[in-house]
């Protein structure tokens, strides 16, 4: 047996104690200076510096051995005092005479041997003196004045009826009686346990059950026994002891904690309790020893509604499975819970069963359980959590004959659904289905009961909801938390959906159309997702602001940006993005329109100021300087005698002689002209070739007159031939006057090609541009020549 002196109370008064303690603490928790928790701090005495306004004081689990009046007398407003699990040996009740508001006093699990009785505040509701070293019951006559007392915890090695007389008139809610150190005597005592609704008896954990006292209680509604060790020989002792406690018509709840027994004795206890008026039987921490054999059990008509067994340790390794399971499967009760027992199976009842509620949590049931079982037609709730179910298709087959089944919980298994097995065959009555914490994927939506209203699929492997799913029009609550969904589903296939839980998924951009699609939604939990704060999310945030604050649960604290990094951790309600960056049309208007206006303005300005002409001049000058640097200076100086040969029409000679030559030769530039540099006696063609070869550049003054001159055509031909023969770039075209294309004879194809392919200098009519024109032209022909005669010999 396991000795559990730390927490002997399992039910009965447990709820009352928790409510009183925590209710009191919660009442003052808003003012933290009123609550002092110094438990587990190795104190050896009560601290002297406690706040005078302390209302809740916890000094439990320390090493305090003495209590003095001065320790707590100044705490006039003290309501809760916890001193359990210390080393206190003596108690003088007078130390509490100044604590007029004291309601809760816990001195359990100390070493108290005696109490000095004095009047005590009548406000006390909870007094626990259990698990101490008292010989007799520690009851003072002054306790009779505690008219508000609800809970009383006692312990003693000897029990006498007279000890209870001072409080016989009180109406208590719960009495805890510690009998761990009770000394058996030859004389059997009879003990009347007052008027209490709940009675909890704690026995020695390592001794076989043996009690030399008859205990009875008036109006007892709840009985709890802790530390019961039985075998086939002393089993009757327990049954005899219970006969005096279980005979009353008011006892409805019976609980056994930490029970070690044989299977035979356990069946006897069941058989003993079956005709009793008890309605709820609970057994926690049951250990079965020795053997498990088939036992005869007669299922009388019983008032028992529910049997609950939690945590069975079976120390019998070889036994008949049928002998064990049959006793439970054939019970004629409404509710049966057998959890944390590691049963591997449960039999189908042989006759139509009365079961309406079955709970087999944390066992080892497989897919074969309840297959082809047609005797559970009244079953309404079936819980098979934490078992070894693997096939959802077989689970659906299990339910086909459970015609009244409404709630099925098969969470925390290893369920999968393979469509190749066929369509699922659920019973049509199921409205609540828990499939959470399994291995289900998207295909699960094709294997659901037809009238399902509440569906829990959280913690599975679902990535999306198929759009072609049908038959879910009645679904009202859907839990898809902790899956891998990337999108917030709409209600196209869930027309009745009112509650959706989809937190802890992979949703980054929930659709703003959700609330339009889901008109009946009353609750949405979509927090704790990796939201990508972008323009798309802005619409969803706006839609959240348009619905009631009660609809979107966890808003705004659970809704935060996850990406980009600059917004990570930012609540969605604080995410701001400009209209310009999200509205493409507005962005185009804002950027493109001003750009177009600027471009038009620049174009007009350039045309007005003739900027293109200036740009062309600068580009030509730059290109000319670059090409000149690429030709070796020595080569140029060795062969060239002139900077430029000028070819022009006689009709343009006035401009050449008055404008062109003076502006070039004033910079020490040598110009070759036919009237002064052609050699007499040579042919015109030979002179043209020599002049072109001896000149760095050949300048052609183009005009309508130029195209009418045959010799100009020859000069252009030879210059063009020299351009391709030597790979040089020696042609400079000056457009003196515009030449219409139609005026160029077809025989002047080279001129057409040159004007189409090469950049030419255009003589500006505005005088302000002449300076740049001459500078550009001089730069294109300027090169240092070797000192030679300008004449051609």
Swiss-Prot record:
Protein name listed in UniProt: Toll-like receptor 6
GO BP terms in the entry: cellular response to diacyl bacterial lipopeptide; inflammatory response; innate immune response; positive regulation of interleukin-1 beta production; positive regulation of NLRP3 inflammasome complex assembly; toll-like receptor signaling pathway
Alphabetical list of SMART domains matching this protein: LRR_TYP, LRRCT, TIR
LRR repeat boundaries on the chain: 54-77, 78-101, 102-122, 123-147, 148-168, 169-196, 197-219, 220-250, 251-277, 278-303, 304-330, 331-354, 355-378, 379-404, 405-428, 429-449, 450-473, 474-495, 496-519
Main function: Participates in the innate immune response to Gram-positive bacteria and fungi. Specifically recognizes diacylated and, to a lesser extent, triacylated lipopeptides. In response to diacylated lipopeptides, forms the activation cluster TLR2:TLR6:CD14:CD36, this cluster triggers signaling from the cell surface and subsequently is targeted to the Golgi in a lipid-raft dependent pathway. Acts via MYD88 and TRAF6, leading to NF-kappa-B activation, cytokine secretion and the inflammatory response.
Database matches in Gene3D superfamilies: Ribonuclease Inhibitor (3.80.10.10), Toll/interleukin-1 receptor homology (TIR) domain (3.40.50.10140)
Keyword Transmembrane helix: yes
Natural source organism: Bos taurus
Side Extracellular, residues: 24-584
Gene from which this protein is expressed: TLR6
């Amino acid at each position: 047996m396991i000795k559990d002196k730390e927490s002997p109370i399992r039910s009965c008064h447990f709820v009352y104690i928790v409510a009183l303690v925590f209710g009191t603490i919660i009442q003052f928790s808003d003012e933290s200076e009123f609550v002092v928790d110094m438990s587990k701090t190795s104190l050896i005495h009560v601290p002297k510096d406690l706040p005078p306004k302390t209302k809740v004081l916890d000094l439990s689990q320390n090493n305090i051995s003495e209590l003095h009046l001065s320790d707590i007398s100044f705490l006039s407003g003290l309501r809760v005092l916890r001193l359990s699990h210390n080393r206190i040996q003596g108690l003088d009740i007078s130390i509490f005479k100044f604590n007029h508001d004291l309601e809760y006093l816990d001195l359990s699990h100390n070493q108290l041997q005696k109490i000095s009785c004095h009047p005590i505040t009548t406000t006390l509701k909870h007094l626990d003196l259990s698990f101490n070293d008292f010989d007799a019951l520690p009851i003072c006559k002054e306790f009779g004045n505690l008219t508000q007392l609800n809970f009383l915890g006692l312990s003693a090695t000897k029990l006498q009826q007279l000890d209870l007389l001072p409080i016989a008139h009180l109406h208590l809610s719960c009495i805890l009686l510690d009998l761990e150190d009770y000394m058996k005597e030859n004389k059997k005592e009879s003990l009347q346990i007052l008027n209490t609704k709940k009675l909890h008896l704690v026995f020695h954990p390592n001794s076989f059950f043996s009690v030399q006292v008859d205990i009875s209680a008036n109006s007892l509604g709840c009985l709890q026994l802790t530390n019961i060790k039985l075998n086939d020989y002393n089993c009757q002792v327990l049954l005899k002891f219970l006969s005096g406690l279980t005979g009353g018509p008011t006892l409805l709840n019976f609980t056994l904690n930490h029970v070690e027994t044989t299977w035979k004795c356990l069946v006897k206890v069941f058989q003993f309790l079956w005709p009793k008026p008890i309605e709820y039987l609970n057994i926690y921490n049951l250990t079965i020893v020795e053997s498990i054999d088939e036992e005869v059990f007669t299922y009388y008509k019983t008032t028992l509604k529910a049997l609950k067994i939690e945590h069975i340790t079976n120390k019998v390794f070889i036994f008949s499975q049928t002998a064990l399971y049959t006793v439970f499967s054939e019970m004629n009760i409404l509710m049966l819970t057998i959890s944390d027992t590691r049963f591997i199976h449960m039999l189908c009842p042989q006759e139509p069963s009365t079961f309406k509620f079955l709970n087999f949590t944390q066992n080892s049931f497989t897919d074969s359980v309840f297959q082809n079982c047609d005797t559970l037609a009244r079953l309404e709730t079936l819980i098979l959590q934490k078992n070894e179910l693997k096939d959802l298709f077989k689970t659906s087959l299990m339910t086909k004959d459970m015609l009244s089944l409404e709630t099925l919980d098969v969470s925390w298994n290893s369920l999968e659904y393979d469509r190749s097995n066929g369509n699922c065959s659920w019973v049509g009555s199921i409205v609540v289905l828990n499939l959470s914490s399994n291995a289900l994927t998207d295909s699960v939506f094709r294997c659901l009961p037809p009238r399902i209203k509440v569906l829990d699929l959280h913690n599975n492997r679902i990535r999306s909801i198929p759009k072609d799913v049908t038959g879910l029009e009645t679904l009202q609550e859907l839990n898809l938390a902790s899956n891998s969904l990337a999108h917030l589903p709409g209600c196209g296939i869930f027309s009745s959906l009112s509650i959706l839980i989809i937190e802890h998924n992979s949703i980054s951009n929930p659709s703003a159309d959700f609330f339009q699609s889901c008109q009946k939604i009353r609750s949405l939990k979509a927090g704790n997702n990796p939201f990508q704060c972008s323009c798309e999310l802005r619409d969803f945030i706006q839609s959240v602001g348009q619905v009631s604050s009660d609809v979107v649960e966890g808003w705004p604290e659970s809704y935060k940006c996850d990406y980009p990094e600059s917004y990570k951790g930012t609540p969605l309600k604080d995410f701001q993005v400009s209209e310009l960056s999200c509205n493409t049309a507005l962005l185009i208007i804002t950027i493109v329109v001003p750009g177009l206006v600027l471009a038009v303005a620049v174009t007009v300005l350039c045309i007005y100021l003739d900027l293109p002409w200036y740009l062309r001049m600068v580009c030509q000058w730059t290109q000319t300087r670059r090409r000149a640097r690429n030709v070796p200076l020595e080569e140029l100086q060795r062969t060239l005698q002139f900077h430029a040969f000028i070819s022009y029409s006689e009709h343009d000679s006035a401009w050449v002689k008055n404008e062109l030559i003076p502006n070039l030769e004033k910079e020490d530039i040598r110009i070759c002209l036919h009237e002064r540099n052609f050699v007499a006696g040579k042919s015109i063609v030979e002179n043209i070739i020599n002049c072109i070869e001896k000149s760095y550049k050949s300048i052609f003054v183009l005009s309508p007159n130029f195209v009418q001159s045959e010799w100009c055509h020859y000069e252009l031909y030879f210059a063009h031939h020299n351009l391709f023969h030597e790979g040089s770039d020696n042609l400079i075209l000056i457009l003196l006057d515009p030449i219409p294309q139609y005026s160029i004879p077809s025989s002047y194809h080279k001129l057409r090609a040159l004007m189409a392919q090469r950049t030419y200098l255009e003589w500006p009519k505005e005088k302000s541009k002449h300076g740049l024109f001459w500078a550009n032209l001089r730069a294109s022909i300027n090169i240092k020549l070797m000192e030679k005669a300008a004449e051609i010999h």
